[in-house]
Amino acid sequence: MGKDTIADLLTSIRNADMNKKGTVRVVSTNITENIVKILLREGFLESVRKHQERNRYFLVSTLRHQKRKTRKGIYRTRTFLKRISRPGLRIYTNYQGIPKVLGGMGIAILSTSRGIMTDREARLNRIGGEVLCYIW
């Protein structure tokens, strides 16, 4: 666990998804709570609950494992998460330069003056901000 709580959150979700774990436990901060709410709303997570141990709060998230059926059999889709703006190199954009992830199939999470939101919400509100991560 480092100082970058967003990278810790994304890495925990990515590792749990690769190891086919059902749940992920991450430290609860305002930023991680907002990102997890967006992931829940967009359908990348199944459920989230807040858990307290001693004096610390944790978010326990249940991952959504989607299985697709093809002619060759059933395969599990993976969730890809990529950290864009990091503490050593911040990436900012205006609303016209907000990237579309996979041509609109994925989402970009932005930190704006009106809070943390997806790329679609930021385009509708016509505001830019710091590009935190891509999820597809």
UniProtKB/Swiss-Prot annotation:
UniProt GO cellular component terms: chloroplast; ribonucleoprotein complex; ribosome
GO MF entry, a single one: structural constituent of ribosome
Single Gene Ontology BP annotation: translation
Pfam families with a match to the protein in the record: Ribosomal_S8
Predominant localisation class: plastid
Keywords tagged on the record: Chloroplast, Plastid, Ribonucleoprotein, Ribosomal protein, RNA-binding, rRNA-binding
InterPro entries cross-referenced by the UniProt entry: Ribosomal_uS8, Ribosomal_uS8_CS, Ribosomal_uS8_sf
NADP as UniProt keyword: no
Compartments (UniProt record): Plastid, Chloroplast
Tree of life domain: Eukaryota
Complex and partners: Part of the 30S ribosomal subunit.
Recorded family membership: Belongs to the universal ribosomal protein uS8 family.
PANTHER family in the cross-refs: 40S RIBOSOMAL PROTEIN S15A
Biological role stated in the UniProt entry: One of the primary rRNA binding proteins, it binds directly to 16S rRNA central domain where it helps coordinate assembly of the platform of the 30S subunit.
Protein name as catalogued: Small ribosomal subunit protein uS8c
